[in-house]
A protein has these predicted regions:
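A ligand-binding cleft/hinge motif common to bilobed small-molecule-binding domains
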Residues: 23-34, 98-102, 129-160, 207
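Extracellular/periplasmic bilobal clamshell ligand-binding domains
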Residues: 221-227
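Short helices/loops that flank or line small-molecule/ion binding pockets
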Residues: 2-12, 97-98, 102, 116-127, ...
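Short, Asp-centered acidic motifs that coordinate Mg2+ and/or phosphate
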Residues: 14-18, 55, 128-129, 145
Length: 227
């Protein structure tokens, strides 16, 4: 929120931009009543950059391989399973709470400061689950990726089911990132910046770096992003 507010108050000259993500722009306004910025009034959208897929990941110490098995495990062990997030009100906190509601289960929430500590505790087995980007040690047998938090399978991981395949009542929200400028930025500058970002997203080396993270390149106009 601090960085987002700094950009909101910056000169609207095209030289200070926000790489916005779903939390500060789309989620936090519903969680905090005293935000110093307004995501609609304080910014103009430039270009959506990427969709960032996340997955339901559990410790390998839990004897489950599917979302259904995980739900059964939770119902058999109520209040004994803890999940981690990158902080109160974060995207993975909210998604795990959505999962709990949809599945009718209980888990203890343990907030951390960043994804690194969550991953470390998950690998060590000191927490049992989280929603994180499916990369890093996830293929090394230390944890199990049960499902992608989406309504369709990821092209990067076609063998991993979408969570709605096993839990249809779960309706996940998207996890994206994109560029914004302070409100008042001249329209010509907005267009020029958007065109430059879209051109960059078409460069093979840029796309490769994004896709190496198992993200999906988006791109698009300010109007498309604003919708």
């Amino acid at each position: 929120n601090i960085g987002t507010d700094i950009v909101a108050k910056a000169p609207a000259d095209g030289y200070t931009l926000l790489m916005g993500v779903v939390g500060p722009i789309a989620v936090n306004p519903s969680l905090f009543g005293n935000l110093p910025y307004d995501p609609i009034r304080s910014f103009v959208p430039l270009t959506p950059v990427a969709d960032i897929p996340v997955g339901l990941i559990v410790s390998a110490r839990i004897p489950v391989k599917t979302t259904r098995e995980f739900i059964q495990h939770l119902k058999a062990n109520p209040t004994k399973v803890a999940y981690g997030s990158v902080g109160n009100g974060s995207f993975n906190h909210l998604l795990m709470e959505q999962f709990k509601t949809a599945a009718g289960v209980e888990m203890l929430h343990v907030p951390f400061q960043g994804a690194g500590p969550v991953a470390n505790e998950l690998i060590a087995g000191r927490i049992e689950a989280s929603v994180l980007a499916p990369r890093g040690p996830w293929t090394a047998g230390q944890v199990n990726l049960l499902a992608m938090i989406s309504t369709k399978r990821s092209p990067a991981l076609p063998n991993v089911p979408a969570i709605t395949e096993e839990l249809p009542s779960f309706q996940p929200f998207g996890n994206w990132m994109g560029f914004f400028a302070p409100t008042g930025t001249p329209e010509a500058v907005v267009r020029k910046l958007s065109e430059a970002f879209n051109a960059a997203l078409q460069q093979p080396d840029v796309r490769q770096k994004i896709e190496e993270q198992q993200w999906s390149v988006i791109g698009g106009s300010p109007d498309q992003f604003g919708k």
